[in-house]
């Protein structure tokens, strides 16, 4: 027996659902949204209600502090069963696993039952999860949640005052994250929210419900921390769950945290991922997670079951050195258009920034592209469904699309990577740079391996099953033959045929695709 464990926000709070159904006018909701809300009376998992509105979700989910005290609470009953030995396998995300390890290291009540073996899939994401769990994040969603909580308790003036105070910050955080705006850009937008939160805390903090009071205290502490910018922490930005920006603070060295929590548990663990190593070298991952000198570690690399040499072609043309922005995007769009014609659409273009994606999107639209064009924005699920159901379509994407989406079959028969995905030079990288004697040493030990791992993740969008066929095009002049990162690119990817000739791209597609594929592309 197995169970999927999620965070509280994924489950229904019976008490909050009851209050929501009493307060809402169901006749004013669309049939699908109404049925989704009513269906929660019969199941606990919010993710099962496909058409549940985002607002309804926030109103009925289990709060961070659950104090309903109901013996019949479905969530509490579920947690009791999970804590028993009823399930032989429990599946959770990295954050819950780390939270459990932190609890155990501090002598607190564990969040997960005792286990005999841990299998950690997608383990390459562990360092980022640790940065969040061992640090602090501030998101737009947290600010909005507090405003709604104040309204729900009828403190309308406080809610409206806070909403006005955080408005500029929310607008800044709503911009798609691409790492170009440093943490310092956002700090001035926190001063007014800080004053307002302090005022609300003084005036009504003691009369709020326990849950809302805790939200207020936590937000006040977070905003204060980000305004102070303590020297013993690193402050940076990252992408939130909705594609916007969140503010982050973390400790400089995560390796000690790993050793004191997760690795101190004397039990067998299997860390698995398709992108843990570059070739057969796990050095970068072990260094980031504090396993570099751990004698218990054993390594294994399994060959891919996919026939890349037969089903994949790598196109890396020789391009001129990067020109001015306008000229560069003109040339890039021209190259992408030629590739789309050679492959008859069916393409995914993975960008490293939203600005580059927007520039190419604008130029492709001006050309009256012959293929349906989609851009992955905030409504990612809806857009990916449309793309999958539109034969011959072209999807422009960035961010989570590098590793978070699955497009099997002919849907992605052309994968275009305009720029090599080097890590963004943020405060985290600046701190890490201090550990190396020269910039070159830092580049070779950290920057290039991280680029290679991200490139492998992006490349993984091309071939998803043993019968998939795809052309992968890397349009970064630094990746071309005999250029600076040519050998690094080859070391990151499986052995596949390589060409600089666009005609060979077209010939490859003609040779591996059925007739119906070309009818789709022409539709």
Roles of regions detected by a PLM:
Residues 352-377:
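Conserved helicase motor "Helicase C" RecA-like lobe of SF1/SF2 P-loop NTPases
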